[in-house]
């Protein structure tokens, strides 16, 4: 088991997590997950490409993303990037999609990874592929010696399925909401508060079923401000995987822009390159100080203040706080 100072995980998105920002997050008491299908494993030096993505007009960005990500993944770069993070003395975490897990996981494990993330729009216990051998998640996790975090799950049944397959953590949501066009392109979106509550209920039932095995519930998406981050934990999440908030950091490789894996799909892009701007350093976004009351910095300070305001001293008890649904009055 790995313990971190704060309930935050850096999302495996090229605009958020590079080897250097993963190292910086580790030194700040959390973990950044590197996208092992991203630009850092396709190009020896992706910085010129990152700069061009940030400079393009929104209407031109998607076509360029498709072009940039058409470059093949290079296993030797997977090894090099993970070694770079490990040499810095922080926790090493990498992510693959279900479609490519079978193809590259041995490279990842041989390179040395502490946490392995399988992240997709929707993940089941057996991923079916026409191009590769199907991924039997239960057998895959059983054969590994590292904790596996899997998602996304959006309801009780899907989450329970992943827990029974052996996942150490379940990602709730489809991630990348600030950059997502899922609602417009395929008509799918997730009410995150309900989804987190449902998955937390699945976790409680699974604990009874398994004799006490605790699975981490990790909210993934719809947390662009600290208030949403706090609400996710109150609904039952143990941690949050943050994308857009960390993409606003001065150190972020997206240079004030943000995009997810859906934006680079070769035939049906379901995401956008969004302008998120820059609000401060990683230190300021996570720990403050804040200089604006807009929820973009000092996420941990906001969590501590909310817990104190509600009379709770730790996240476990905060997860049981009463929650009332009201109309949005903002």
Question: Model segments located where?
Answer:
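Alpha/beta catalytic cores of nucleotide-metabolism and tRNA/nucleoside-modifying enzymes
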Residues: 2, 55, 69-83, 145, ...
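Active-site entrance/lid segments in N-terminal catalytic domains of soluble metabolic enzymes
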Residues: 1-210, 216, 246
């Amino acid at each position: 088991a790995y313990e971190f100072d704060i309930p935050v995980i850096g999302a495996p998105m090229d605009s958020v997590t590079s080897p250097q920002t993963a190292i910086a997050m580790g030194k700040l008491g959390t973990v950044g997950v590197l996208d092992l299908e991203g630009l850092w494993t396709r190009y020896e030096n992706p910085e010129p490409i990152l700069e061009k993505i940030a400079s393009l007009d929104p209407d031109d960005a998607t076509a360029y993303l498709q072009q940039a990500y058409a470059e093949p993944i290079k296993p030797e770069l997977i090894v090099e990037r993970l070694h770079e993070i490990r040499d810095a003395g922080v926790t090493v975490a990498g992510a693959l999609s279900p479609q490519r897990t079978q193809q590259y996981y041995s490279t990842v494990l041989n390179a040395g990874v502490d946490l392995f993330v399988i992240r997709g729009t929707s993940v089941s216990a057996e991923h079916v592929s026409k191009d590769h051998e199907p991924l039997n998640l239960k057998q895959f996790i059983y054969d590994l010696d590292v904790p596996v975090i899997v998602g996304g799950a959006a309801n009780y049944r899907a989450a329970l399925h992943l827990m029974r397959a052996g996942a150490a953590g379940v990602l709730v949501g489809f991630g990348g909401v600030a950059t997502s066009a899922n609602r417009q392109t395929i008509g799918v979106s997730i009410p995150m508060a309900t989804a987190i509550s449902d998955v937390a209920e699945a976790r409680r039932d699974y604990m009874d079923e398994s004799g006490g095995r605790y699975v981490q519930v990790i909210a993934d998406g719809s947390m662009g401000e600290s208030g949403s981050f706090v609400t996710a934990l109150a609904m039952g999440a143990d941690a949050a995987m943050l994308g857009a908030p960390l993409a606003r950091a001065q150190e972020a490789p997206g240079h004030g822009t943000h995009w997810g894996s859906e934006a680079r799909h070769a035939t049906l892009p379901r995401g956008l390159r969004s302008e998120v701007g820059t609000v401060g350093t990683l230190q300021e976004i996570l720990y403050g100080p804040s200089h604006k009351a807009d929820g973009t910095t000092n996420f941990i300070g906001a969590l501590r203040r909310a817990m104190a305001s509600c009379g709770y001293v730790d996240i476990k008890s905060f997860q049981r706080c009463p929650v009332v649904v009201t109309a949005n009055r903002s």
